Amino acid sequence: MEQESLNQERLVEEIAKRVKEILQLIGEDTEREGLKETPERVAKALLEMTSALRSPQPYIKVFSLAENENSSVEDQIVLVKDISFSSLCEHHLLPIIGKVHVAYVVGKSGKVAGLSKIIRLVNYYASRPQIQERLVEQIAEAIMKSDIQPKGVMVIGDALHMCTYVRGVKDREASLISLSTRGIFSTKPSLKSQVFRLINTSKKSSTFL
């Protein structure tokens, strides 16, 4: 733990030096009151937003829904909707802010994951320089290969990208929707329709899907 703390302090120090250099290159006075602590703050924020690069993937702990040998939850759709996430666009290192919906079909094992485990997985793959299309693919693949042993997985991402919001075309309305499917969701369109209906049931007032 002490070694990790020392490594973190060293990373903050090294990144802060470079942030200070960048500020100076764009013409800022890094000694003025408002910027004195900015390099260190930026370094800490960047490390927090990319923490997954230095951490293992969280384990998806599962449990069985079947109460006895004669009961079955096979083929049940489990949906975790409106998981908020933030990430960094790998092209400009500007924020991506949105929501992810994760659905899976329970397999023969009758196993499901706790709600927090799915949320942690989403946050893990978001905590790095990322593109949204890859994000939903990585989440879907991780769940498909997990101990849940689902028959299929469907992941939908809907987000605003600050790289088009504050620069370039400066569009304030456009959002990106990405979809990834695995297993039975790839072969049965009716299941995808069911998930979309579930997502829109009791839909919260939101900018996102």
From Swiss-Prot:
Zn(2+) binds at C89, H92, C163. It catalyses: GTP + H2O = 7,8-dihydroneopterin 3'-triphosphate + formate + H(+). One of its GO terms (molecular function) is zinc ion binding. The keyword GTP-binding applies. Pfam families: GTP_cyclohydroI. Keywords: GTP-binding, Hydrolase, Metal-binding, Nucleotide-binding, One-carbon metabolism, Zinc. It comes from the Archaea. GO terms for cellular component: cytoplasm. Its EC number is 3.5.4.16. Pathway: Cofactor biosynthesis; 7,8-dihydroneopterin triphosphate biosynthesis; 7,8-dihydroneopterin triphosphate from GTP: step 1/1. Coiled coil: none annotated. It is an enzyme of class 3 (hydrolase). PANTHER family: GTP CYCLOHYDROLASE 1 (PTHR11109:SF7), GTP CYCLOHYDROLASE I (PTHR11109). Toroid-shaped homodecamer, composed of two pentamers of five dimers. Belongs to the GTP cyclohydrolase I family. This is GTP cyclohydrolase 1. It comes from Sulfolobus acidocaldarius (strain ATCC 33909 / DSM 639 / JCM 8929 / NBRC 15157 / NCIMB 11770). The gene is folE.
